[in-house]
Structure formats: C-alpha cells, structure tokens
C-alpha cells in the first residue's frame, strides 16, 4: 500500500499519514541543522526552521520531499511572481549548485540560511509583506454603468 501512496493524489487517512511522515523527515533534518556548529550563531534558528518546514511542505506538491519545476512554478504564481521555465530552471540550478533538477529540503534550508542572495530567497522573505499590503477584495465587484467605461 505504501508504494501506491506517492502516486495517488487524494485526501483522507492516506494523505494524513503521508504528510505526517514527511513532517517527521523534515523535523529530523531540522534537528541536524540545530546541532550543526556552522549555524550556532544564527538567531531564532528554531523558529526559522519551523517556518521553512511549513513553507516547504506547502509547496512540495508531489509529497516526495522535493520541489520540482512544476511545484516551483505554482509557488511563484501563488506569490504573484510568475516566471518562465528558463528562469525557474536557473533558480533551481542556483539553489542546488547545478547538481539536481529538484530542490531538496536541505538545499532549501541552506539557501534560506545562506549568505548569498537567491531570487527564491528574496521572494520567500517578502511573501508575507506582499500578502499583508494588498488584500484581495471580497464580494461581488461594484456595479458600473456605460458612462464609466473607458
């Protein structure tokens, strides 16, 4: 049954188990980062790692522990910054160092904690600010008459 889980896109108990396993895997990687001396001077590291885990799980659409090109495309569209295929391939290459076509959680955390400025990092950092400043209008659009049209 576990072999078929990764290929089925459904909710319910199977999806909950899949997400629980994914969260456990990401939590283990977070513990590795917390124990790593390289990141010991990083302030608010546990809070940052928890936020990174949430974002990563949100955009890991295939639940395989990697963000692929289509997941990245959806993420950028959701953030209001659509990119071309070529731009997204370049972003993935920058994050992974050209080694892979997908972004693993380790690569994602290294990018977010790293010193170099990645496009994806900037988008992720400012996502919250952009969402707060421009709330989407609710309800039906206002009525217009012919005189108000251009």
UniProtKB/Swiss-Prot annotation:
Q: What gene codes for this chain?
A: Aif1l
Residues bearing the modification N-acetylserine: 2
Lineage, broadest ranks:
Eukaryota, Metazoa, Chordata, Craniata, Vertebrata
UniProt keywords (A-Z) are: Acetylation, Actin-binding, Calcium, Cell membrane, Cell projection, Cytoplasm, Cytoskeleton, Membrane, Metal-binding, Phosphoprotein, Repeat
Give the range the annotation lists for the signal sequence.
none
Q: Name one Pfam family in it.
A: AIF-1
Compartments where found: Cytoplasm, Cytoskeleton; Cell projection, Ruffle membrane
The record's annotation in InterPro entries points to:
AIF-1_EF_pair, AIF1/AIF1L, EF-hand-dom_pair, EF_hand_dom
Q: Which domain of life is it from?
A: Eukaryota
Q: What is this protein called?
A: Allograft inflammatory factor 1-like
Organism of origin: Mus musculus
Q: Describe its assembly.
A: Homodimer (Potential). Monomer.
Keyword Phosphoprotein assigned to the entry: answer is yes
> Which is a Gene Ontology cellular component entry for this protein?
ruffle membrane
Q: Which molecular function GO terms apply here?
A: actin filament binding; calcium ion binding
